[in-house]
Amino acid sequence: SIKIEEYTAALSNKIDLDYVAGTYYGILPSNVETTLTLNADGTYLLTRTFKEKQNEREKLRGVFQMLDGNVLMLAHPSSGDNIFYKVRDANSIILIDSFGNEPNRTNEKQYILKRM
């Protein structure tokens, strides 16, 4: 019999995009107001406002992928450095490094974006 995980994995990409689609917001270090909109078609819009740099604003658009079911990889076309978030639950994601490491427990709350 086919394992439930394999069946789920086969379906996961489309489901995951629908599941994570939405707009997330938070203030990330160091004082960067961050709004990330993930669309069900696999595109994203990331807006960052740098409070410490006279509210300088940066907008990035691109495509994202689901890796391992709960890691979002945002392809960053201009710098070539991808941005990674991990899905924590239905309403929040957390910024992680390219190795999949989450921030340590003491300051992880500073790296969370919550669904708006």
Placement of each model-derived feature along the sequence:
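Lipid interaction determinants
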Residues: 1-59, 73-116
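Short, conserved beta-turn/loop elements at beta-strand boundaries and strand-helix junctions
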Residues: 68-71
